[in-house]
Amino acid sequence: MTASATSTEGQEAASTSGFWGLTLGSIGVVFGDIGTSPLYAFREAAHGAAHGEPVSRMIVLGVLSLILWSLFIVVTAKYVLLLLRADNNGEGGTLSLMALGQRALGRRSMFLMSLGVIGASMFIGDSMITPAISVLSAVEGLKLAAPALEHYVVPLTVFILVVLFAVQSKGTARVATAFGPVMVLWFASLAVMGIVHITDDPSVLAAINPYYAVQFLLSHGTIGLVTLGAVFLAVTGGEALYADLGHFGRKPIQSAWLFFVLPSLLINYFGQGALVLSDPAAIENSFYRMVPELLLLPLVVLATAATVIASQAVITGAYSLVSQAVQLGLLPRFEVRYTSESHAGQIYLPRVNRLLLIGVMLLVLLFRTSSNLASAYGIAVSTTMVADGIMGFVVIWKLWNLRAAVAAAIIVPFVIVDLSFFSANLLKLFEGAWVPLLFGAAMAVTIWTWRRGSAILVLKTRKIEVPLDDLIGSLEKRPPHIVKGTAVFLTSDPTSVPTALLHNLKHNKVLHEHNVILTIETAQTPRVDVSERVRMEKISEKFSKVRLRFGFMESPNVPRALAVARKLGWQFDIMSTSFFVSRRSLKPSSQSGMPSWQDHLFIALSRSANDATDYFQIPTGRVVEVGTQVTI
């Protein structure tokens, strides 16, 4: 055997092991939410269909058929086979899809921006419900194992969730390696439990025929629509497949879903159906009734571990989404802490963590059971799925270069299905669906206020700013005292004089040897190639313009990026460089163009924003802050 042949075989083996490693990782992270749905989805759907009456055979077959075809259409066809191909430089998710759509159109679209904001806001609302309903439904198994422990279900759930949120600041890199094996054990258990009961009554497999789904909806009227809202619980988490695209890649996610996760879920749902056909009373908790009493406690422990992993994935997703929103200018700069030196994506946002914890605690204490929480679950996810579908149309039409009619033929059937689920979930508005809508609306108002206030602030400051070329010309005619070193002035408008530069000249009456007007931009792509990171333009002997570009999923590190400028001829030395940053103190104005409440909200958001020094990772010892007062 030649050396080249040996090398090729080694590369193929490494590639294969890498693929299976990513597949295992995706099982542990991507499918946690949808993978824990069997705990409550079939039970809630059958309960809703029976409407207080005994569960009949036609109800069981109808519900199973609806679940099966919902998983086929919404998750498999729409997300796994279609939208996973709509990646933004390898990344997925609502905001990535929004940015991809903007890029496809070649301009900023307020419609796409609104869809992206709505989808992202509803994801945050869903991020509060998923941990609450998942962990609560798992711990409820204790009521069957030991009825005397029923009063401890809520306190134990609260304890588990508090611990989960408390350890976020420590990072999850160490324990994340166990997520894959635990979830593999979970899905394997789902399949085994289902097989045992399906063999008792194989006739339940008749529900594979879509006739039972259609017949159920046609014959049950409004109750059928209510049931559809409960059936949707089986597909919640499907949007996470797309959001985690950048972490694992399309093929590992597709393989894990098609060959392991989907079969395990379907087998378990059909097993629950077979159990209820033989024992209608089992519908009270059809999942835990699938195992003998001896295995009940181990199953509760495994289910709790699976729901904690599912919750962790959702929490991490919320951090990532908010971080992207900050980079895209949709939210103020939140404090971001990096919990792993080797994984840049391992981040922790203290404020987001606190808000999620408060929301989750309120949900658990107010609703107290997973059945009650099920009424609140679904509306946020269905809203996000509708938004994804519409934005997906733009990408298929403009980026994939298909005719509008062809793109519509592909995506409209999915949007119709999504709208059907959205309508069904709206029926639960007063039973609890208002909760995620309230959370999502609060998030959307926050984003809208920040965008609107920031735009007004830019317009007001531009009116009083001095053109940079005019100042340079004036300084050349009457030069001030020159001091050694480099001054870097951060600004959003490179054509105007940064406020910090004006204040430095006014109060200190000095100018540095080298002055850099630094602008930081966020691209519509997740990451920016190093070769495109820095653009430098020398505009006079003492002044240069530098533009730094970062992707919306990157952590902006200004000193590291400026080091790249050495290749462009700038001998950057951090120890001889001072960074001048403006800190604005905002005051409300009756002429701002916004309502008074929005003025005050924008000012509060601005005050809560993290320091530019920390956010851009500039050494504090090299920073000079200049305060200015602005009336908006």
Curated annotation (Swiss-Prot):
Pfam families: K_trans, K_trans_C. Its main location: membrane. It is found in: Cell inner membrane. InterPro entries: K+_transporter (IPR003855), K_trans_C (IPR053952), K_trans_N (IPR053951), Kup (IPR023051). It is a multi-pass membrane protein. One of its GO terms (molecular function) is potassium ion transmembrane transporter activity. The keyword 4Fe-4S does not apply. The chain crosses the membrane at residues 19-39, 58-78, 110-130, 147-167, 178-198, 216-236, 257-277, 290-310, 347-367, 377-397, 404-424, 429-449. It catalyses: K(+)(in) + H(+)(in) = K(+)(out) + H(+)(out). Keywords: Cell inner membrane, Cell membrane, Ion transport, Membrane, Potassium, Potassium transport, Symport, Transmembrane, Transmembrane helix, Transport. GO terms for cellular component: plasma membrane. It comes from the Bacteria. Belongs to the HAK/KUP transporter (TC 2.A.72) family. Transport of potassium into the cell. Likely operates as a K(+):H(+) symporter. This is Probable potassium transport system protein Kup 2. It comes from Bradyrhizobium sp. (strain BTAi1 / ATCC BAA-1182). The gene is kup2.
